[in-house]
Amino acid sequence: DLTTLKESDIPYLRRKLGVVFQDFKLLSDRSVKENLLFVLKATGWTEKEEMDAKIEEVLDKVGMKGFANKMPHQLSGGEQQRVGIARALLNDPEIILADEPTGNLDPQTSVEVMEVLRKINANGKTILMATHDYALVLKYPSKTLKFEGGKMFEVVQRTI
């Protein structure tokens, strides 16, 4: 119940959420691993072996194993977005908020990123995604809510 949430509890609530941004939000002067370490350290992780294992785990989940030492400018847009998804998974969130995760990607790369999100969802994670790409909504049937004119509507879809 958010109406009774104390301000001091907000950081703990945030840790239950993973966020995927449209424009990746990677630190350009840090490697993939350093980007992920930054988040782990900021959320209280201290053991190097545990952090290394967690980074390897999330990079593997998004198909980026072997990219830990790459810099963001060495990655394609889709690869950067997969690192963003890995970052969102670091603290094992209950919900992943994805704000236009395919908005800056070409159609083929968008499908690849959606496949990563679909697999994460199939493994039990709730993903709340905002998108303007109706073709992706049709390709990946799920519970879909449409916001229009200040009102919310549920869109009923047929599964194929």
Model-derived regions: residue spans:
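Conserved ABC ATPase "signature" region
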Residues: 1, 37, 41-44, 48-67
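Short coil-to-helix segment of the ABC ATPase nucleotide-binding domain corresponding to the Q-loop/switch region
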Residues: 30-38
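Conserved ABC ATPase signature
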Residues: 71-75, 79-81
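Helix N-cap at the start of a conserved alpha-helix in ABC-type nucleotide-binding domains
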Residues: 107-109
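Conserved catalytic motifs of ABC-family nucleotide-binding domains
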Residues: 92
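Catalytic Walker B motif of ABC-type/P-loop ATPase nucleotide-binding domains
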Residues: 96-99
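ABC ATPase NBD coupling module
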Residues: 2-18, 48-49, 120-122
